[in-house]
């Protein structure tokens, strides 16, 4: 079978809600990375067979945001593109679709990843197309409804985390401690420049003066403590334990990579970073969607012909501390190998981009000692996706 390799992998910094990227459309963040990958690899843009990009909150951006990103990123109009929505798994699903298209011989080179600007998601006035006869009407927050609400139970994703708290007996202190650890690891990695190789700075024009260059993730917080987090009120349930401090944020960002057949990489003298070994997807009861990575990880390992003990590093999306703790309990993961640079609680969770972001961060950790990695994300609606990669040899 054709070996599929990852030949370049980058991401933007992750902006906080209403932060540095609030006026930068998702497709511009994606275009920045496409342009950078073409320049970095020296690849002829016309040799790219397809562009596949995850993007969840598409309303108001225009037709097919992936196509917009591709064209604005400098690709010729002959290169097709399409947009993927698998909620939080969109970015990783895009990479899986690229992988599948190469294995089947349809493509040789694909740009794949994810992008999201949650700050720019619009408010909607449903059923207003043909007017209202009388009475008050309300607006729907497209970010909350299309991105963060379990449509089957009509409640926020945070309630699914509270359901896992009850099922697994997870305490508030455990969640806050997990969140503090995530922040501390991210602070350390940021201060040591460990994200520098994976981040492409984004220049933001200003009405007056020089452009602002965004180089670092905005959500990383120093001086976070369990004591400080314990003062926060429950965010989703009156007597709950899930708070803004032990959950991922609302964020903006993008991540992208060059997916190729090994033969094409050799032909073009492009040195790959890693080999895609296999993927797994799984579904569970939507009310406990956060536990779905367990099944996805098991399937990805089986398809990759690997055991959990073969994995040197894990990048698992931290939708909620409670969700992450539940998955850890089921899989019995070695904590020293999981999210060693911090996770989404600290770095952020731009939903359409996160699937690609966790893989980008994982790829930049591979070396002679860390040869195999696994990444996974839970997905609203009761799903999860996972992937296994190995350092290219």
Swiss-Prot record:
Which InterPro entries does the protein's record reference? Answer: Thiolase, Thiolase-like, Thiolase_acyl_enz_int_AS, Thiolase_AS, Thiolase_C, Thiolase_CS, Thiolase_N
Where in or outside the cell it occurs: the entry states: Cytoplasm
Recorded hits in PANTHER family, A to Z, give: ACETYL-COA ACETYLTRANSFERASE, CYTOSOLIC, ACETYL-COA C-ACYLTRANSFERASE
Catalytic residues, chain numbering: 88 (acyl-thioester intermediate), 349 (proton acceptor), 378 (proton acceptor)
Pfam families in the record: Thiolase_C (PF02803), Thiolase_N (PF00108)
The molecular function terms of the Gene Ontology recorded here are: acetyl-CoA C-acetyltransferase activity
| Family in the record | Belongs to the thiolase-like superfamily. Thiolase family.
Q: What Gene3D superfamilies does the entry give? A: 3.40.47.10
Where is this protein primarily located? cytoplasm
E.C. number: 2.3.1.9
GO cellular component term, pick one: cytoplasm
Which catalytic reaction applies to this protein?
Answer: 2 acetyl-CoA = acetoacetyl-CoA + CoA
Record key words, sorted: Acyltransferase, Cytoplasm, Transferase
What name appears for this protein in its UniProt entry?
Probable acetyl-CoA acyltransferase
């Amino acid at each position: 079978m054709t070996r599929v390799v990852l030949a370049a992998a980058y991401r933007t910094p992750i902006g906080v809600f209403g932060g540095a990227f609030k006026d930068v459309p998702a497709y511009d963040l994606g275009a920045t990375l496409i342009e950078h990958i073409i320049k970095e690899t020296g690849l002829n843009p016309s040799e790219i067979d397809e562009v596949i990009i995850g993007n969840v909150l598409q309303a108001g951006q225009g037709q097919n945001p992936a196509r917009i990103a591709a064209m604005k990123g400098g690709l010729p109009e002959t290169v097709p593109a399409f947009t993927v929505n698998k909620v939080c798994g969109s970015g990783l699903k895009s990479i899986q679709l690229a992988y599948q298209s190469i294995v089947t011989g349809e493509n040789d080179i694909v740009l794949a990843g994810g992008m999201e600007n949650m700050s720019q998601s619009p408010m909607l006035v449903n059923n207003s197309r043909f007017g209202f006869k009388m009475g008050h009407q309300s607006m729907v927050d497209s970010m909350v409804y299309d991105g963060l609400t379990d449509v089957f139970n009509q409640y926020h994703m945070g309630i699914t985390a509270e359901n896992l708290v009850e099922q697994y007996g997870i305490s508030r202190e455990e969640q806050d401690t997990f969140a503090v650890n995530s922040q501390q690891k991210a602070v350390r990695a940021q201060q040591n420049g460990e994200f520098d190789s994976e981040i492409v700075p984004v220049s933001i024009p200003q009405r007056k003066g020089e452009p602002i260059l965004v180089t670092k993730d905005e959500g990383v917080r120093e001086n976070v403590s369990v004591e400080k987090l314990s003062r926060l009120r429950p965010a989703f349930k009156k007597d709950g334990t899930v708070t803004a401090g032990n959950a991922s944020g609302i964020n903006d960002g993008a991540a992208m990579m060059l997916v190729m057949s090994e033969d094409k990489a050799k032909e073009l003298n492009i040195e790959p970073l890693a080999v895609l070994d296999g993927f797994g997807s799984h579904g569970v009861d939507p009310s406990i969607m956060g536990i779905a990575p367990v099944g996805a990880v098991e399937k990805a390992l089986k398809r990759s012909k690997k055991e959990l003990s073969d994995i040197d590093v894990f990048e698992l999306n931290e939708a909620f501390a409670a969700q992450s703790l539940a998955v850890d309990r089921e899989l019995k993961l070695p904590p020293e190998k999981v999210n060693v640079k911090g996770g989404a609680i600290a770095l952020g969770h731009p939903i359409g981009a996160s699937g690609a972001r966790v893989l980008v961060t994982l790829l930049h950790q591979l070396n002679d000692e860390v040869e195999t990695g696994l990444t996974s994300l839970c997905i609203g609606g009761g799903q999860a996706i996972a992937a296994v990669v190995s350092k290219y040899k």
